[in-house]
């Protein structure tokens, strides 16, 4: 029988990795200038401002808990944890306010949360009569790419999470323009790269996956998919049905490379904790691939 070859074998694990930790920056350090309203239904007495978060004013207590945890200098939290705490269904397609598909678990925070609110005299409100298009100057937005950043905003009354697209970005000044359908806590998030690297079984949360990877981590191309899957399942059935409905036999597939990790590169660490789906092109070290078998 002619054997089919798979170019790489990816081990899927779940392990939490840390996001950025903040040294309690002031609101002036995060957003040094007052927002400029481009479009919005505000009265002459109303002013759009940013201020330190006031979690005690949030009607949704879960939002208050999440914002407090993210802004805690002594707490390390990644986006996947934030999404789970806010009960964001990552099995469903998530889109920005401009209807662009996005996987927020592949982002990390660049700032802590700050409150975007309307001030009228001495009164602060988190409610708005329609969308507000505004320009914000964000220090962390300097020298970033527009396509890689979003604003994550949470409605403190309903708990609804929005991923707000950046419409304009001045990399020199950090000035961003975006449209908000609601007000409340907001932070800047940036897409993180998904990379391939040498396997690290010691970092895997799943012991079965770790044990299987340890057995194969030093083996070069030529092992079967069965060699890997056998240690992960309690069945001897070699037939597997893929998501597209196709049924394959594990013994028909042989590795054309050594085992590698696909991981999320976050700050100075790696994370395997991803929700949703990912379309990716995977690059391998040329020395690890058996090109003659392809």
List the predicted regions and their residue ranges.
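Feature for mature exported/ectodomain regions
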Residues: 2-4, 20-112, 118, 123-148, ...
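Hydrophobic core
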Residues: 13-18
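C-terminal beta-strand-rich structural cap/linker in extracellular carbohydrate-active enzymes
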Residues: 176-197
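Beta-strand signatures of extracellular beta-sandwich domains
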Residues: 150-152
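Surface-exposed loop/edge segments in extracytoplasmic proteins
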Residues: 158-166
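Short proline/glycine- and polar residue-rich coil/turn motifs
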Residues: 126, 169-172
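Solvent-exposed strand-loop boundary residues in beta-sheet-rich modules
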Residues: 155-158, 192
